[in-house]
Amino acid sequence: MRVSRLLLVTLRDVPAEAEIASHQLLLRGGYIRRIGSGIYGYLPLMWKVIQRITAIVRDELNTAGAQETLLPQLHPAELWQRSGRWQGYTAGEGIMFHLEDRQGRELGLGPTHEEVVTSLAGELLQSYKQLPVNLYQVQTKFRDEIRPRFGLMRGREFIMKDAYSFHANEADLQNTYLEMDQAYRRIFERCGLAAVPVDADSGAIGGAASQEFMVTADAGEDLILLSDDGTYAANQEKAISTPSKAIPLEGASMELISTPDETSIDVLCRSHGWHQSQLIKVLLFIARLDDGVEQPLLISLRGDQDLNEVKLINAVGRLSGQEVLDCRPIQTEDLNKQGIDTIPLGFIGPDLDDGVLRSARSWTKQFLRCTDSTAAAMDRMVCGANQPDQHRLYATWADLGGAPKSLDLRKARAGEACVHNPEAHLIEKRGIEVGHIFQLGRKYSEAMDSRFTNEAGKTEHFWMGCYGIGISRLAQAAVEQHHDDAGICWPAAIAPYEAIVVVANMQDQTQAELGESLYKQLLAAGVDALFDDRKERAGVKFKDADLIGIPWRVVVGRDASDGVVELVERANRAVQKLPHADALKELLRTLRP
């Protein structure tokens, strides 16, 4: 492709909307253009990157025995209602775009395809003899993100590869899950990315087990915790650790103490010389469940620990037997709306009486009590006395009505000891999620009553797996991991072009003819090459070449009269001055080993 004919509009200044390097460089390099909030157009260079990534994904998925298909983007509401996910995905802060057709039928724009593919499987896969089946697609997805940001990292429209496998038993599902794990590792390696597999929460997709693949980058939205012995890695949402030991609180029987206006852990510790680990922190949340119930939560943690809201949501789901649609802290205005004025915020204890909810207008009249294991293990503690300006000192769980059931609700943190090896400790890194695989079990097949006939002639529900890769996000993650102060440094396998021939001065006939000759020789050798034949200044061309990040550059300049060119490797900026025939041989040796 001749650059003079390429739709290439580069920017010298950093667009104000772009916060992270990869977003800035894709905009400046003419790869993408913003159309609206979270909506981007893929320009020719970017589309070639997307196609190269997709080709690698297809190759590995086909090798793993998966079959490509294409499912509809418009989903009838009935399918999602059958699975029980329609309300959660469309109400309140749900992420599904939804609409009505002219007959008043509700439809959704697919953020994911479990419902559609499970429905099809129930119709088409009748016998165990047809199993296992693994179907995948590469398609545009839609999610109504509350706050689109970082370009393609968190958009409202994006390209994704999603796959769904169907099995006769759990063992077969686990085999395919492991095969897909290996396929994903090969995909990311071939794309030139350092991706870390980590234990992950299954989130709204659900299922028994899941694993994310994280590209490590300072701009990553996710915090991942890894053991320094290299044997454990998890998203912080899922991570476990051994917390530091609490400092014992020595004392006699429980006593009331006056703590006027001392409503925070920090203030209490400064005023009385306590350590945070000697206090109980009580939080109030409200959870909205999929059966319409608004459930108040009373959460107790050791004072030096932080709440992991994902773990809380999962615990509430298990305890209530319902899907949690929304979970957030209770604010003073929430209490006012409910007509509740008897809760002394800042002085609450783990034993706050349910009677304070008596006047609640829409909430249930009883707390769901959730106590973290660090709090449940405390012998004596400082906690709120459930009346203004009062705390209890040397309280025990017996004083508070008995030991609570222990849950894991705390955030694991860097520096803490690992559960699997007390000698190992957690370190933290930022990560960009580019892939996620799930063992769904029978969650969707049971909800949608999709069955097959087993060897015994009886019908049973499918075992299912789900496997996703964010293709467009992966492309930007590659830029985040591979760039320098001059621009993008694409890994060779996913670069839009393998090489670019840059003629410093197209007005010089010798340079122009040699550049043309080298370009045609590269094309004849099967190299996907660019030829910068623009009548621009050499400095402009070199800056553009650095910015767009083509892995190899052949510079035809003032030494062209001697038949000498420069061969430049973009990743390390190494320059070789070679006779043009030798430069061509060296480039072909590298690109076609």
UniProtKB/Swiss-Prot annotation:
Residue runs in coiled coils: none
Gene (UniProt): proS
Domain notes for this protein: Consists of three domains: the N-terminal catalytic domain, the editing domain and the C-terminal anticodon-binding domain.
SUPFAM superfamilies associated with the record: Class II aaRS ABD-related, Class II aaRS and biotin synthetases, YbaK/ProRS associated domain
Reactions mediated catalytically: tRNA(Pro) + L-proline + ATP = L-prolyl-tRNA(Pro) + AMP + diphosphate
Subunit structure as annotated in this protein's UniProt entry: Homodimer.
InterPro entries for this protein: aa-tRNA-synt_IIb, aa-tRNA-synth_II, aa-tRNA-synth_II/BPL/LPL, Anticodon-bd, Anticodon-bd_dom_sf, Pro-tRNA-ligase_IIa, Pro-tRNA-synth_IIa_bac-type, Pro-tRNA-Synthase_IIa_type1
GO cellular component, one term: cytosol
Listed EC numbers: 6.1.1.15
Keywords: Aminoacyl-tRNA synthetase, ATP-binding, Cytoplasm, Ligase, Nucleotide-binding, Protein biosynthesis
Lineage, opening ranks: Bacteria, Bacillati, Cyanobacteriota, Cyanophyceae, Synechococcales
UniProt cross-references to PANTHER family, sorted A to Z: MITOCHONDRIAL RIBOSOME PROTEIN L39/PROLYL-TRNA LIGASE FAMILY MEMBER, PROLINE--TRNA LIGASE
Matching HAMAP family: Pro_tRNA_synth_type1
Domain of life: Bacteria
Pfam families tied to this protein: HGTP_anticodon (PF03129), tRNA-synt_2b (PF00587)
Listed GO MF terms: aminoacyl-tRNA deacylase activity; ATP binding; proline-tRNA ligase activity
Protein name: Proline--tRNA ligase
Organism listed in the record: Synechococcus sp. (strain CC9902)
Any one biological process term the GO annotation gives: prolyl-tRNA aminoacylation
